[in-house]
Amino acid sequence: GDYVIFHELTHLLDTANLGAGDQKKNAMVRGFLEYHASQIETIKILGYESIGENISFSMKQQVETVASIKSMQNFVDEPANTAKSLLRRSDFPKDLETLLTTAALIFNYYGRRSICLMHAQDYREDVDIIEFSEFIGTAQLAALDTFL
């Protein structure tokens, strides 16, 4: 899907604009980059070209991902569910890569979720975010909601 290309291009653009440097050294910048790229990919997977369009959709709407066709609800919840399974591993965090991947998945979920909060007719919060708050911090996650 071309939504993946738009996700990665957003990372490139944001990195250039923010002068982010080494992403592994700045977790919040890395988090924002993932959050924003996930917003763009969500708009794109829904078939919209721009945030300026009149975006409206149902969480039951089917979207085609690289792996399969799934509902928007499943598309949005997928990174959260993967992050939760990583957080619940007895050896978490096994290594730096696992730690960074888990954080990226959480920010990815928040980016997708933000588009749903703003534009879905029937969005419901299915994911319990308590584990995310404990991992990333309540204040940081609350700050993401200010971007809505």
Question: Which stretches of residues belong to each language-model region?
Answer:
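Catalytic micro-motifs at enzyme active sites that drive phosphoryl/nucleotidyl and oxygen chemistry
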Residues: 1, 22-26
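Active-site recognition of the HExxH zinc-binding catalytic motif
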Residues: 2-19
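Hydrophobic, Leu/Ile/Phe/Ala-enriched alpha-helical segments that form helix-helix packing faces
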Residues: 9, 13, 41, 45, ...
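Short catalytic/ligand-binding loop motif for oxyanion handling, primarily in non-cytosolic enzymes
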Residues: 13, 21-23, 32
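Short alpha-helix boundary/capping elements
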Residues: 13-14, 45, 49, 111-114
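Post-HExxH zinc-binding segment in Zn-dependent metallohydrolases
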Residues: 25-64
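Pan-zinc metallopeptidase signature
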Residues: 71-148
